[in-house]
Regions:
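Polybasic low-complexity intrinsically disordered regions
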Residues: 1-86, 90-103, 109, 162
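Short, solvent-exposed polar/charged micro-motifs at secondary-structure junctions
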Residues: 10-15, 115-117, 157
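Structural motif
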Residues: 36-37, 148-158
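Hydrophobic (often cysteine-bearing) scaffold residues that line and stabilize catalytic clefts
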Residues: 66, 126, 155, 159
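Helix-centered, glycine/charged polyanion-binding patches within enzymatic domains
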Residues: 81, 86-152
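Charged phosphate-binding loop/patch that engages nucleotide di/tri-phosphates or the phosphate backbone
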Residues: 157-173
Length: 173
């Protein structure tokens, strides 16, 4: 089982969204519904195992919908069951992934038929694993704040954070 989700990577304070010139043409303005926040920057999409090991990540502009990054994110993924949040709720995506051999589970909205049976608390608890990983990355490495001024610097910072985080899963004697 693998879990996918995304988090914002703002490059400036919200008051400067329309004046920002860093990463012009690459970053743009997006909305994060869980934080009720408009931000200028990127979105980092991650694929994580149940134990919290980061398998893959993709960086997109802030306005790119989560569904558009799924195929890049899961390419080469060995896990066949993928848990996601409401941002990935789509029949077309579910059908596309089924043809590739993946089973996509997303919770249903509360007003949808069968939501109480479908949204099992154990699956929801498993899905929260990735939220915990994002919190740890923010606490340990301050991943949501970047001082990178070029794409190479941004990529290097993210690679270093993922490497350092994943190395914590191995015991060195």
């Amino acid at each position: 089982i693998a879990i996918i989700d995304s988090f914002p990577l703002p490059l400036c304070q919200p008051v400067r969204n329309h004046r920002a010139s860093i990463f012009k043409g690459k970053a743009d303005i997006g909305y994060n519904a869980s934080k009720h926040l408009w931000f200028y920057g990127f979105k980092v999409h991650m694929l994580v195992t149940l134990s919290g090991y980061i398998l893959n990540y993709v960086v997109t502009a802030a306005s790119v919908h989560d569904i558009r990054a799924v195929h890049d994110l899961i390419s080469g993924c060995q896990q066949s069951v993928i848990l996601a949040d409401l941002g990935y709720l789509s029949h077309e995506l579910k059908d596309d992934l089924a043809q590739e051999g993946y089973v996509l589970w997303t919770p249903l909205r509360q007003n949808m038929v069968g939501a109480r049976r479908h949204n099992h608390w154990k699956l929801m608890a498993m899905r929260r694993t990735i939220e915990t990983r994002f919190s740890e990355l923010a606490r340990l490495f301050d991943i949501e704040h970047t001082l990178a001024r070029g794409l190479t610097g941004l990529q290097l910072r993210l690679e270093q954070i993922v490497l350092a985080y994943n190395l914590s899963y191995f015991e060195f004697n």
